[in-house]
């Protein structure tokens, strides 16, 4: 089976606010397993333990540096909430990915549907049209 973006170097990112480390480790292991199943080239990984209420997260910053530096052209996460539950933070992260021609891939949800439900899909469609950018999915 051919998966989209298999030709792009992939960054795997996980985040959990659960106090048990095993939850975070299991989430990353699931991403690694899924990346292998889809035959993605993993350029790197990062994790954050704690809330997604801020952009000031070491693992998130590592991922963004990798994208900005061209090391990764796609980011694999379990679902959109692993980036943040806050729509304003989600928009900043997705705009960053869009500005750097990178895409976000979710393993356990339909990203476009999640964005639609959160009322964010139209923003990125409009932004892509106005700025001549690709969609970040």
Positions of predicted regions on the chain:
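Short, structured surface patches at the beginning of a domain
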Residues: 1-137
């Amino acid at each position: 089976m051919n998966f989209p973006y298999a030709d792009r170097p992939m960054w795997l990112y996980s985040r959990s606010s659960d106090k048990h480390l095993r939850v975070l480790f299991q989430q990353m292991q699931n991403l690694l397993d899924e990346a292998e199943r889809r035959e993605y080239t993993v350029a790197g990984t990062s994790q954050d333990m704690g809330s997604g209420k801020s952009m000031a997260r070491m693992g998130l910053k590592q991922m963004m540096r990798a994208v900005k530096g061209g090391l990764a052209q796609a980011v694999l996460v379990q679902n959109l909430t692993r980036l943040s539950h806050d729509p304003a933070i989600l928009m900043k992260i997705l705009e960053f990915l869009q500005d750097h021609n990178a895409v976000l891939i979710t393993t356990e949800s339909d990203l476009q549907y999640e964005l639609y439900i959160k009322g964010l899909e139209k923003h990125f469609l409009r932004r892509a049209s106005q700025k001549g950018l690709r969609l970040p999915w």
